Regions:
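N-terminal secretory targeting signals
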Residues: 2-112, 347-356
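Hydrophobic alpha-helical segments and their boundary regions
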Residues: 24, 29, 34-35, 106, ...
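Hydrophobic alpha-helical segments, especially transmembrane helices
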Residues: 29, 33, 141, 314-316, ...
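Residues in and immediately flanking transmembrane alpha helices
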Residues: 42-45, 130, 153, 276
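Active-site-adjacent loops and short helices of periplasmic peptidoglycan-processing enzymes
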Residues: 70-74, 78, 83-246, 250-259, ...
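Domain-terminus/edge residues, biased toward the C-terminal soluble/receptor-binding domains
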Residues: 226-230, 236-356
């Protein structure tokens, strides 16, 4: 038989073993629980850490796209700056030469002026009349004179080409390359509206070409007694087209003898059909529509080197006069100078009517 003490010792050993097993199992469960908890915390931390990174990455990706969209919208709404015509701010040859410092009794704004009685050749007013200066579009009077002299068919169609586009001054024109007009229409626009492409096309299509035409311009000037004059092209855009007031009186007298030139230069407006649309041109001389003036022939001109220019045949106080104004200082001063001369002639130089 087992002793009581042995049984008790075995019982407690077994109990200790069971307790150890239970304790170990409990520890394992606790460890497993803590492990899961730690793992969950780690995973949660990773997710939390990843979310800002993901948001930052997405924001970073969206930022250039949003900026591009804003730039695109801005580009759409941005007003395009208007294209400006070339502005030439060079002083006139007359100003450089000091011609504006010369005074006259009428305080004219033109540095050169000459008023001559067409019938008697009496000089009523003279200011720097021998100075040789650029004459701008006054040139077109000589261009018109040659076209008229040549007796070319006025109904012949002429097409504007790239050669007629102004590359010297960058001046604008409503006559587009490819437009076709009759020679007579081009002559009308050149004289009345000072259309540069029209004048150039007239010279370019002259028999023999532009070079021959310019040579004939200079020959014609010499033939009619213009000794201070030189032409290099038919529009007046070049400052190398030069003359004096004395010579321009001669040119006006010669051109005035041609009825067609008188009629076209004093027209106040003209409509031309170009393709499927019409263009309305108006005179460059506002005195044409002034009832106080009786103008038989006229031409205006302007480039910066020449200043504002004006030549006219007109009748004032019973006298037929030729007026020349070159290198006028302002946009309207050539007209104001003409008005001063008209009032002066009416007051002091009226025609003397013979007693019968």
């Amino acid at each position: 038989m087992f002793s009581k003490s042995l049984i008790l010792r075995n019982y407690f050993s077994l109990l200790d073993s069971k307790l150890l097993d239970l304790w170990g199992s409990a520890l394992k469960q606790i460890a497993r629980g803590w492990g899961m908890l730690l793992l969950s915390m780690c995973l949660a931390g990773s997710v939390m850490a990843a979310e800002p990174a993901k948001s930052t990455t997405a924001a970073a990706a969206k930022k250039p796209v949003a900026q591009a969209q804003r730039n695109k919208a801005k580009a759409k709404t941005k007003t395009k700056a208007p294209v400006k015509a070339r502005v030439d701010t060079r002083p006139s040859f007359g100003k450089v030469a000091g011609l504006h410092d010369v005074s006259d009794e009428l305080s004219l704004k033109s540095s050169v002026a000459l008023v001559v009685d067409q019938e008697t050749q009496e000089v009523l007013l003279s200011k720097n009349d021998s100075a040789v200066l650029p004459i701008a579009s006054i040139t077109k009077l000589m261009t018109a004179l040659l076209i008229n002299d040549a007796q070319l068919p006025m109904d012949e169609m002429i097409t504007i080409t790239q050669d007629d586009v102004d590359t010297e001054k960058g001046s604008r024109s409503r006559l587009q390359v490819g437009a076709s007009l009759a020679r007579g229409e081009l002559l009308h626009l050149a004289l009345m509206a000072s259309e540069n492409r029209a004048a150039h096309a007239l010279g370019r299509t002259y028999p023999g070409g532009l070079q021959v035409f310019v040579g004939l311009m200079n020959l014609k000037a010499k033939d009619i007694g213009m000794t201070d004059t030189r032409f290099v092209e038919p529009t007046g855009l070049s400052s190398k087209n030069q003359s004096s007031a004395k010579d321009l009186v001669t040119l006006v007298q010669t051109a005035y003898r041609e009825p067609l030139l008188r009629d076209l230069s004093t027209s106040d407006s003209h409509v031309v059909d170009v393709g499927r649309h019409s263009l309305i041109y108006k005179t460059t001389n506002r005195l044409i529509n002034n009832p106080s003036w009786d103008i038989g022939l006229q031409k205006t001109g302007y480039i910066s080197e020449a200043g504002q220019c004006l030549v006219m045949q007109t009748k004032i106080a019973g006298r037929k006069l030729i007026m020349v104004f070159l290198d006028s200082a302002g946009k309207f001063s050539r007209i104001a100078d003409a008005e001063r001369v008209r009032r002066w002639v009416e007051a002091k130089h009226r025609a003397v009517i013979p007693q019968t």
